[in-house]
Amino acid sequence: YMGDVKDAGIKHIFITTPTPDTVRLFQSLYDHGLNKPGFTFYAAEMILSDESPEVVYGSLGYFAPAAMLPSSEKLTLFKKVLEARLNKSIDTASSTFITSALSYDHIMAVAHAIRSIKNDSQIVNRENVMKYLRHMDFAGISGQVSLSPGSNDRAGMAVQIFNNQGYKADGKTVNFVSIGFVKTDTGTLIINDDAIIWPGASNF
């Protein structure tokens, strides 16, 4: 597939596959020597912080969106407990941490819905769970958790844009840097151009 992309002279590549396939595509970008100046890569998913060097080289300079977790005592405590459980420090800019925080709140959302159903002496079934989820509103570790009216989208969930900037000083962990965000009140995308590293960067 990437061979066809190379032959076609395509330089702006959007990857919308799940993480495992995204990793394979970045490996293919590396294999075909496509990570070089003049190219731009965008993906729907962040790669893990401990991917192979070939994948990191192939994905250097790519952009990926992720939830922006607001600072709070709950988030700090969650990080502390998670670090104690894993017996290692946690990078709050990693996809693993962000996904963990969101997943925790997803489980709590279902728990809140079930509790509300029981408090109202209703039957716990699929229909009622969905009905009550649409009315949930609680302070989670990823921020205030509620759904936008008439949709399944999280209300007021800030989004940031990460840029893969190679490895951190340890030479083993991918260095994802937040270079922009979408303002929740206006939908405006704010980008810090000076913080971006592009594909083919010579200082990798």
State where each predicted segment sits.
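Short, well-structured alpha-helical segments in soluble
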Residues: 1-9, 31
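Amphipathic alpha-helical protein-protein interaction segments
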Residues: 3, 15-18, 96-103
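Active-site lining segments that contact anionic ligands and/or coordinate catalytic metals
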Residues: 10-11, 36-39, 54-60, 142, ...
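Hydrophobic alpha-helical
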Residues: 11-32, 106-109, 116
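Extracellular/periplasmic periplasmic-binding protein-like sensory domains
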Residues: 29-107, 114-128
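Segments of small-molecule ligand-sensing domains
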Residues: 82-191
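Extracellular/luminal ectodomains of metazoan preproproteins built from arrays
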Residues: 185-204
